[in-house]
Amino acid sequence: MGEKSNCRVPEDLFTGLKVTDPQEAECLHPPVSSGKEQHSQSELLKDVDAQPQEDQGEEECFHDASASFETEEPGADKLENKPEDDMNPSELDEEYLMELEKNMPDEEKKRRREESSRLKEEGNEQFKKGDYIEAESSYTRALQTCPSCFQKDRSVLFSNRAAARMKQEKKEMAISDCSKAIQLNPSYIRAILRRAELYEKTDKLDEALEDYKSILEKDPSVHQAREACMRLPKQIEERNERLKEEMLGKLKDLGNLVLRPFGLSTENFQIKQDSSTGSYSINFVQNPNNNR
């Protein structure tokens, strides 16, 4: 064999192997200039859920939305046929997002915040028109755009996407969004109230009661929370009694199945509850019919 020549790797190969800038990787859409200013706070005071008014400020209400990527957007062609919760920046851990964005220039953060505000306003208008699918898509894209350092902005976006999902009966997804909103802003009463309502609708009464209590601790004037705190304890007690009866009924059926080969039934065993301790005792009765 001849002598080996010095091999040079083509520069084109290096070009093809360049690592994408983390800042570019997280941008799912091309930059869009922010030509619109944010709506005034007074224009957003109307919440379609008729939630009690709270401290609005940066946390002003968004309007309910629903999830879809059917609406075509520049650069979104790869997302259209995927579930919106699959690998979206809006679903990533906030601390992880913040780590990715730590070297992002302030000007870029400002631009992205303005763009997310534009998408938010777009979602608001879509929601008010009843276009919940399109509105949720706008909120999701706003979350993908909004830098994680603006936690209150992202909290509002999560809360309003939850409202949109409520409109489409996507209750579990809406609960998840509310929880993210509360994590980012623990004093965000609107998000807590929305999650409490969702817990009620999914028969998670204990969790709902805890949220309503949390609301009253932060703002005793919220009538809906006060009314729920008076109503839910009785509902929880009735539910627990119903579950206990169902459990005892199933145990009785199982007991009869096991005892039948021995000529016995659960009627041979009397269960008595101690009123002072609430505990139960079981007594064997040879001829239960004679004791009636």
UniProtKB/Swiss-Prot annotation:
Please list the residue ranges that the record marks as compositionally biased, kind Acidic residues. 86-98
GO CC entries: cytosol
Q: TPR repeats: which residues?
A: 116-149, 155-188, 189-222
The record's annotation in InterPro entries points to: TPR-like_helical_dom_sf, TPR_domain_protein, TPR_rpt
State the residue spans of region: Disordered. Answer: 20-125
PTM annotation (Phosphoserine): residues: 90
What spans are recorded as compositionally biased (Basic and acidic residues)? 36-49, 75-85, 99-125
A single Pfam family, by name? TPR_8
Q: Which keywords has UniProt assigned to this entry?
A: Phosphoprotein, Repeat, TPR repeat
Question: Oligomeric state and partners?
Answer: Interacts with the GAP domain of NF1. Interacts (via TPR repeats) with HSP90AA1 and HSPA8.
Q: What is this protein called?
A: Tetratricopeptide repeat protein 1
- Per the UniProt record, the source organism is Bos taurus
